[in-house]
Design a protein with these regions (language model features):
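Sec-type signal peptide cleavage vicinity
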Residues: 2-8, 18-332, 352-354, 385-414
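GGW-centered surface loops in extracellular recognition modules
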Residues: 313-375
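Short aromatic-cysteine micro-motif
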Residues: 353, 359-459, 463-476
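Extracellular/periplasmic catalytic domains that process cell-envelope and extracellular macromolecules
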Residues: 141, 195-196, 358-361, 450-454, ...
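Residues within well-ordered beta-strands of beta-sheet-rich folds
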Residues: 149-151, 202-204, 366-368, 457-459, ...
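Short consensus segments that form the blades of beta-propeller domains
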Residues: 93-99, 448-452, 553-556
C-alpha cells in the first residue's frame, strides 16, 4: 500500500511538471502581445508647409537651389519677370489644427520586412492624440518593430493603396513612423508628424504702380499636363503619380496695401494657394489674367507660362510663391537712331546700345540717360540775372508753360531769342543751354553714333517737355497742375518716381528722380513773366525716394541747376 502511494505521488508530480512545461511553450507568447491602442499613446502633430526645407531659399531642380529668373513679354506693353520661391510665410497653427482634428483618421500597422498588414483601426485626433473609435478598437501586436501609417478621410483606400485626387490634395494629410513595440508593462508613446500630401502655389505680383481689381486663373497648359491624382502604397511607403488631367483654378488677388505714390514697389498676392499633386512640373502651369489694371493697361487676356531652363517639380508638403514682377516696357532710342525695348539692348541680351528713353513717339521726343555737363550744375545765364527777358515765348500765365514743347527752338533758333541773334545752344552766356547742346552720350568702347543719330542736336527741354517725360515715365497727371487754382510756384505733383528710375537703371544709368538729398533742380528752357520781371522755370526731383516732383519759377537766372538734355529723333 505504501509503495502504491509513493508511485501515485510521483505520477502526479510528473504530470504537473509536464503541464508546466507545456504552458511555458505556449502561454508566454500570448501574454507578451500588446494591444497597441491601449499600451501606446499615439501623439499627432500637424506640420507646416516646408517644415523640412530651408524656407529662406528658392529652388530650381533641387531643394535649396536659387531659382533662375525668366523674362516673358506679355505682349501688352508689360514684361513679366518670373521666379518660383518657397513660401516663407508662417501661419498660425491653432485654428488649422482645430479644423484638422474635426476629421476621421485611420491607422495601419505593417511588418517592415514582409510589408504584411498587422492591424488597423479608425479614430479621431483630439488635443494632439489619436483615439480609436471603431467597433474593433484594437491592434494586437507581438513585441517587435513596426511601421505605423496614419491618414485622414481625404484618401480613397483599396487594400494597401491610398489614393488622393488633386481636388483633395490641399486637405489630405499623411504620417508614417517606425516604432519598436516592447512587452514591458509601461505606457509607450509613438509620434506622428502629419504632412500635406499636396503642394500649394500662390502667385505674387510686384510692380512699380499699384494694382486694381486683378483676377486670373492658374491652369494646366493642356488636358494631360498636370497629375490628377497620386496613390500611396502604405505597405512600402512609395508614391505613384496618376494620369494627367486638365485643371483650372480661379485666383483672386488682394489689392495693393501700399500707399499710392509713396512706395518703391507695390504688391498683390492671391488670397489662397492652389493645391497640386507632388511631382507636378511647373512648366505645365499657365497664369492668365482675367481682369485688373497696372500702368494704365488692362491686364485681361494677358498670360504667361513659367518655363524654366531645367525641370522644376513640386514637392509634397511644399508651399511656393510664383513671383511675377510686372515691368513697364520702356522704349529706348539706340545709338543707330532706331528704337527698341530692353531685350534689344546689350542689357537685355540684345546687341544695341541705348542712349535715351523715348517719352513721346508722336513728338519723336526722348530724354538722355545721364545728366549733361559731366553731371555738374551750372547757371541758366551769366547775363543780367534779374530784369531781362531772353525768350520770345515767355508766358504771363504759368499754366501756359505746361504744354509748351519748344525746347529745341529755344536752344537752337536765333529767332526764338529776344535779340533775334543769340543761339543759346552755342553761347557761353547761357551755360545750361550750351551744356545741353554739347551733350554727347557716353558710349562703350568701339560703339559710335551712326545712321540718323550722326549730327543730331540735343536741347534744353521746356517745361512742357518735362511734363511729357514725367507723364510717360512716372504717370504724372498733368491735370493736377492745369486745374490747380493756386500759385503753381512750389507746387508738388505726384508721380511714381521709382517706376521712372527703372527706365534708367535697367540700362545701366543712374536714377533720375531719386537718390539725391534734398533733391535735384533741373533747368528748363522756359521763362515766366507774371510780374515786372521774368522768372526761369526750374523743376525739382524731390527725394530721397519721395513721391513728388516740384515746380519752381526761379527769381534769378544765375541759380545753379542740373541739365538733362532731350532730343527730337527722326523716324
Amino acid at each position: 500500500m505504501k509503495k502504491k502511494t509513493i508511485l501515485s505521488c510521483i505520477s502526479c508530480a510528473v504530470l504537473m511538471l509536464l503541464t508546466a512545461c507545456s504552458n511555458d511553450d505556449i502561454t508566454p507568447t500570448e501574454k507578451s502581445k500588446v494591444d497597441a491602442t491601449k499600451a501606446i499613446e499615439f501623439k499627432v502633430d500637424f506640420a507646416d508647409y516646408n517644415s523640412e526645407q530651408q524656407v529662406d531659399m528658392t529652388r530650381t531642380g533641387g531643394k535649396g537651389e536659387e531659382a533662375v529668373q525668366q523674362t516673358i513679354d506679355l505682349g501688352n506693353g508689360i514684361v513679366a519677370q518670373c521666379t518660383l520661391q518657397r513660401d516663407t510665410t508662417r501661419k498660425s497653427k491653432a485654428a488649422p489644427t482645430r479644423l484638422l482634428e474635426n476629421d476621421t483618421y485611420t491607422m495601419l500597422a505593417y511588418d517592415p520586412v514582409t510589408h504584411a498588414l498587422k492591424g488597423e483601426v479608425t479614430g479621431t485626433v483630439t488635443w494632439g492624440v489619436f483615439t480609436p473609435t471603431s467597433s474593433n478598437p484594437s491592434i494586437i501586436l507581438a513585441p517587435g518593430t513596426y511601421e505605423f501609417v496614419l491618414y485622414n478621410s481625404k484618401f480613397t483606400r483599396s487594400g494597401n493603396n491610398l489614393t488622393v485626387t488633386r481636388a483633395n490634395a490641399g486637405e489630405a494629410y499623411l504620417g508614417r513612423t517606425t516604432y519598436t513595440v516592447t512587452a514591458a508593462p509601461i505606457k509607450q508613446s509613438v509620434a506622428f508628424t502629419m504632412k500635406h500630401v499636396g503642394a500649394s502655389v500662390k502667385v505674387k505680383l510686384t510692380g512699380y504702380m499699384d494694382f486694381t481689381g486683378v483676377t486670373g486663373t492658374l491652369s494646366s497648359v493642356n488636358s494631360t499636363a498636370v497629375p490628377g491624382s497620386s496613390t500611396y502604397d502604405a505597405s512600402t511607403g512609395t508614391w505613384t503619380t496618376g494620369t494627367g488631367a486638365a485643371m483650372t483654378a480661379n485666383t483672386t488677388f488682394n489689392g495693393s496695401w501700399e500707399t499710392r505714390y509713396y512706395s518703391e514697389t507695390y504688391t498683390a498676392i492671391t488670397n489662397d494657394g492652389t493645391a497640386f499633386m507632388p511631382s507636378t512640373d511647373v512648366s505645365k502651369l499657365k497664369l492668365t489674367f482675367t481682369g485688373g489694371n497696372i500702368y494704365k493697361i488692362n491686364m485681361a487676356g494677358a498670360s504667361l507660362t513659367f518655363n524654366p531652363t531645367s525641370t522644376l517639380k513640386l514637392d509634397a508638403n511644399g508651399a511656393y510663391v510664383l513671383n511675377v514682377k510686372l515691368m513697364y516696357h520702356f522704349l529706348y532710342l539706340m545709338s543707330d537712331g532706331s528704337r527698341g525695348f530692353i531685350e534689344e539692348t546689350t542689357y537685355g541680351g540684345g546687341t544695341k546700345t541705348p542712349i535715351a528713353v523715348v517719352v513721346s513717339q508722336s513728338k519723336h521726343l526722348a530724354v538722355a540717360l545721364e545728366d549733361a555737363n559731366n553731371g555738374n550744375p551750372c547757371v541758366w545765364s551769366t547775363l543780367d540775372p534779374h530784369y531781362v527777358q531772353y525768350n520770345k515765348s515767355a508766358k504771363d500765365d504759368a499754366k501756359d508753360l505746361l504744354t509748351l514743347c519748344n525746347g529745341y527752338s529755344e536752344t537752337w533758333d536765333a529767332s526764338a531769342s529776344i535779340d533775334n541773334t543769340t543761339v543759346k545752344g552755342t553761347s557761353t552766356n547761357f551755360p545750361a543751354f550750351k551744356a545741353a547742346g554739347d551733350y554727347t552720350p557716353t558710349l562703350p568702347s568701339g560703339v559710335h553714333l551712326t545712321g540718323k543719330m550722326v549730327g543730331k542736336k540735343w536741347h534744353l527741354p521746356s517745361i512742357g517737355e518735362f511734363m511729357v517725360a514725367y507723364s510717360a515715365l512716372g504717370f504724372a497727371k498733368l491735370s493736377d497742375a492745369t486745374t490747380y487754382s493756386g500759385n503753381l510756384n512750389g507746387l508738388y505733383l505726384d508721380w511714381y518716381s521709382s517706376l521712372a528710375d527703372v527706365a534708367f537703371t535697367q540700362v545701366g544709368a543712374r536714377m533720375w528722380s531719386s537718390g539725391f538729398s534734398p533733391g535735384k533742380y533741373y533747368h528748363s528752357s522756359s521763362e515766366l513773366t507774371d510780374s515786372s520781371f521774368p522768372h526761369r522755370a526750374v523743376l525739382q526731383t524731390y527725394s530721397p525716394k519721395n513721391h513728388a516732383y516740384r515746380l519752381w519759377f526761379a527769381y534769378h537766372s544765375n541759380w545753379d541747376g542740373y541739365v538733362r538734355a532731350f532730343i527730337n529723333y527722326d523716324e
